[in-house]
């Protein structure tokens, strides 16, 4: 592992924005996709104790790995559970005994450890031109930007106020725009009685160990798809999020640490966790801090919030899931506006890769789903194919490094 880079002294005033960015990242994760875990648990016929153990293991694992990686490398390395894998398990657990599924989780996690130690994944990441990476990220995030505004047709008062507040705060005090809409949104929801906390009873989660079983059927029907889905749907775009905002930590330790964490937590129910993609973008850009060297605090904050949720298991996770979907969508979309703008600027900055980057952007935004693999992978494949044909090959590493910084227009360069 490379040595930790130097960081300027941290003042108390440096904490507010990255801590809020970490909190928003956690809220969006639990409020947006965590319901898939409960659906998969229901399909598998898990008891409340086993379901709570799943929540405990994945939350604690995500929190500790993200906290460690962010501290070790002084970069905002946000981790998360594998959302596409959870969606896959909603159907897979219907026909796979739970103990065999646990064994499959462990095999998949061990494969990620091997991948990280081998260094192969980092070499693949370095091959991707920066314009293609920017186009991919912009395409992935576009639906979230659109979602912030399309929610107005369902909840015009809440969404309208949040958008109006965001624009006004951007004009008056841009640094506090995202914090402002978070506070305003929560206050409005509580005033309207749309978030009922009266019945909330915090109880410590108790992990339950399940002895894994191994079978060829689970290897082929669960472990292999789980590995491929998580690799293409989470690790690939997640690493490109970091690269797009100028962070250079190698993929190798990230894949290794999250793989080890997944391996340890699998017997307690955790299916897989990895570097985050969409929610990571909330913490890697300018909204987290003007100074990129201070954004690692967002990774620490997110890790602490995940651990806090994990300690209380289902009860605290249910609070975030109780937030209206329109609030989650609007909060996420507005928090990601800067990153979407920066990514689009980076995609079209280099004339040599502009058309291929736009193809990548549109293909990723289309969210093509084939062979059980999500749109991020196919968007990248189509974009790389277009780049290869249009440019006659991939640029050398030195050329890729040169093109990253000067080609992005200065006003947008750090406007995430």
Spans of features found by a protein language model:
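Intrinsically disordered, low-complexity non-transmembrane regions of multi-pass membrane transporters
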Residues: 1-21, 193-209, 391-416
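Hydrophobic, membrane-embedded alpha-helices of multi-pass small-molecule transporters
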Residues: 16-29, 33, 177, 208-237
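Transmembrane alpha-helix interface/packing and boundary motifs in multi-pass membrane proteins
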Residues: 25-27, 64-77, 261-271, 367-371
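Hydrophobic alpha-helical segments within and immediately flanking transmembrane helices
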Residues: 36, 60-62, 82-94, 279-286, ...
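Membrane helical hairpin/interfacial module
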Residues: 49-53, 57, 65-121
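Interfacial segments of multi-pass membrane proteins
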Residues: 88-94, 166-167, 280-298, 386-387
